């Protein structure tokens, strides 16, 4: 089976990143914004893995592991913030975040 051309993979990564960015900018629900950030991080990880595969370097896989670790930490902290936000306001509308004090 042949290798995926770099251009095709970067196009897919760009589309994924754009979808994630669109989700962060348009959606007002905190949970959907968190999921959109995860999509953006996965798009960057895909670009690193693809570049490492094309140039036969393990650096792309190392960066993928780093991004995977950062995404897991971001998900944990983000979900904790989402839970606290929901317990306080009983909704996940991010426009209400300006009312937060503490």
Swiss-Prot record:
One BP term from GO: ATP synthesis coupled electron transport
Keywords associated with the record: Cell inner membrane, Cell membrane, Membrane, NAD, Quinone, Translocase, Transmembrane, Transmembrane helix, Transport, Ubiquinone
EC numbers, comma separated: 7.1.1.-
Gene Ontology molecular function terms on file: NADH:ubiquinone reductase (non-electrogenic) activity; quinone binding
One Pfam family per UniProt: Oxidored_q2
Assembly mode: NDH-1 is composed of 14 different subunits. Subunits NuoA, H, J, K, L, M, N constitute the membrane sector of the complex.
The family this protein is said to belong to: Belongs to the complex I subunit 4L family.
Protein name, UniProt field: NADH-quinone oxidoreductase subunit K
Organism: Acinetobacter baumannii (strain ATCC 17978 / DSM 105126 / CIP 53.77 / LMG 1025 / NCDC KC755 / 5377)
């Amino acid at each position: 089976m042949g290798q995926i051309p770099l251009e095709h993979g970067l196009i897919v990564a760009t589309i994924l990143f754009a979808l994630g960015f669109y989700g962060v900018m348009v959606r007002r629900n905190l949970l959907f914004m968190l999921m959109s950030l995860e999509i953006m991080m996965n798009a960057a990880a895909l670009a690193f893995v693809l570049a490492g595969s094309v140039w036969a370097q393990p650096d792309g896989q190392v960066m993928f592991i780093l991004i995977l670790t950062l995404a897991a930490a971001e998900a944990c902290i983000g979900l904790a913030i989402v839970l606290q936000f929901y317990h306080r306001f009983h909704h996940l509308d991010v426009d209400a975040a300006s009312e937060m004090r503490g």
